[in-house]
């Protein structure tokens, strides 16, 4: 069974429409989307949990607790796949990565659009360094965690219980 947890009502309604199409196309797909905040969601009997650019919007305390909740809800050998924006540990490298990413985005978006999004997200994002994220995941009890993807200040990783 696949369960998606979404905090925004409009997104859940859209996702539920997509599930209807999936079921019409592939038969009785066991997919559901629930309106909830993952800080309040009870993870249980999970083989795999994914979190794509979600934890970075939480306080460090909430993030650590959610990672612990995910670990507790995973079956032995279960996986946690996640992607997050990260900060570099070195301020100079952080600036280099940030401006290099802006250059990359300018190939697809207007400068004003890039800066508007940056200003909008700046007060909401709470990125950690990779080392801080790795420590949180290992402190929750995961046996291993490895980066599987990186692009500028964004990483994807896999952790195994």
Segments (PLM) and residue ranges:
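Class I SAM-dependent methyltransferase SAM/SAH-binding core
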Residues: 1-40
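Conserved acidic residues
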Residues: 46-47
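A conserved beta-strand element that flanks and buttresses the S-adenosyl-L-methionine
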Residues: 50
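Short catalytic micro-motifs in class I SAM-dependent methyltransferases
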Residues: 53-57, 84
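A short glycine-rich, Lys/Arg-flanked "PGG" loop and its adjoining helix->strand segment in the class I
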Residues: 64-76
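Conserved beta-strand signature within the Rossmann-like core of class I S-adenosyl-L-methionine
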Residues: 77-85
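C-terminal alpha-helical "lid/dimerization" subdomain adjacent to the S-adenosyl-L-methionine
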Residues: 85-140
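Core SAM-dependent methyltransferase catalytic element
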Residues: 134-161
């Amino acid at each position: 069974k696949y369960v998606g947890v979404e905090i925004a009502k409009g997104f859940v309604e859209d996702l539920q429409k997509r599930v209807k199409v999936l079921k019409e196309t592939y038969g009785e797909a066991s997919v559901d989307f629930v309106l909830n905040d993952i800080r309040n969601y009870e993870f249980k009997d999970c083989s795999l949990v994914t979190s794509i650019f979600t934890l970075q919007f939480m306080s460090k305390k909430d993030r650590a607790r959610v990672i612990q909740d995910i670990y507790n809800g995973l079956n032995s050998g279960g996986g946690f796949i996640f992607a997050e924006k990260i900060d570099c540990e070195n301020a100079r490298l952080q600036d280099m990565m940030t401006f290099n990413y802006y250059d990359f985005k300018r190939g697809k978006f207007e400068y004003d659009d890039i800066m508007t999004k940056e200003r909008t997200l700046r007060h909401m994002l709470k990125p950690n360094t990779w080392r801080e994220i790795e420590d949180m995941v290992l402190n929750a009890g995961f046996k291993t965690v490895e980066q599987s993807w990186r692009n500028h200040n964004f990483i994807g990783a896999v952790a195994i219980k």
